[in-house]
Amino acid sequence: MSTSPLVIAIDGPSGSGKSSTSRGVANRLGLARLDTGSMYRAVACRVAHLGIDPTTNPRDAIKVAQSCHLEIDTSAIDDRVVIDGEDVTKEIRDPQTSAKVSAVATIQPVRDALTARMRQVAADRGRIVMEGRDITTVVCPDAQVRVLLVADPAIRVARRQAELGEKVDMAQVIDSIVRRDRDDSTVSTFEEPAEGVTVVDSTHLNLDQVIDAVIDLVPVTLR
């Protein structure tokens, strides 16, 4: 197994399979893993807990992003997230939190603050899979492997509903995906591949096939 630095950057819209794919790739190659979306979700939780409305008071939301103590497990197994001493691992996946994320994630200084943290994690870990919306273009544009993971909208909705559980309303899932993609598209161009980014369409692939497709892009000398 290589010890050379390796960053695998995976971008994609909601429900495209980024999390399952990044976890699988990290497991197979023995890499660290960072779900960058969990950083935005954690900040959104903290902002809400402090009673801050980011739409009317973005300045205080920015302060939270810049000064909070954020702990994110980068193992391929655990997704534990702690912000300012509070474990928000479960809360950040709640549909109510999802509805609040865009208001925080679309504030450019918040993105700048968290981007700096993401880059530091990549530098500290050395060999890592990073998933998000703008990893291939903004966070790690020089990553050795850059992937845009896509899937048909119907497939994305079905995957997200399965992830959230049977009790989640389909209309709510569709609204969440459409809203997040629309809002995030105002601050990142994740829907079209940048130069040098490989598109992997997971619509007709199972998870193992998607993982294989990403790993095939990793130079043998870096595996």
UniProtKB/Swiss-Prot annotation:
GO cellular component, one term: cytoplasm
Record field: catalytic activity: CMP + ATP = CDP + ADP; dCMP + ATP = dCDP + ADP
Region annotated Disordered, chain positions: 1-23
Protein name as annotated: Cytidylate kinase
EC category: transferase
UniProt keywords, alphabetically: ATP-binding, Cytoplasm, Kinase, Nucleotide-binding, Transferase
InterPro entries: Cytidylate_kin, Cytidylate_kinase_dom, P-loop_NTPase
